[in-house]
């Protein structure tokens, strides 16, 4: 289902000091960081928010009134380094038809994810910093926004790494769904598995299913 999001068009205005006639890019969501990157002062940013009655949909993120909220994209904006994984990746890649109860993301060990977990809507997994970007890919979500998510092979490695916290029925179902995929890449899968030290365990499962 395609959601047509109302874009926010911000034009530079003269507020207090002399502002150039530059035009801000179109944004579905606007943040102080986006404004700052475009040379807009904090004062002008918040004046625009106030004058146009924009709604705060997350910490530091604003959008047009009554705008449909793309939760995945908002999470990405709140924590750009985090990558959607596990349940979220199972569902996105079509390895399960069970929509995630919570958004699942992976971030490097030591990152303070309290802001993401405080409301109970997210489950966070951690990994060594040097392994965080292995298998990372940018995809278009269901609302047309670009978000980071792990590819199929990294997703299967995460499945095996987290097998003790995943229901056995779901584990088997996801793994079988991957095996049935025509676009699977077993060479890449085993390369990743070696990096995450799950190659022996994964090989045993694969020998049974292949």
Model-predicted regions and their roles:
Residues 38-49:
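Short amphipathic alpha-helical interaction segments
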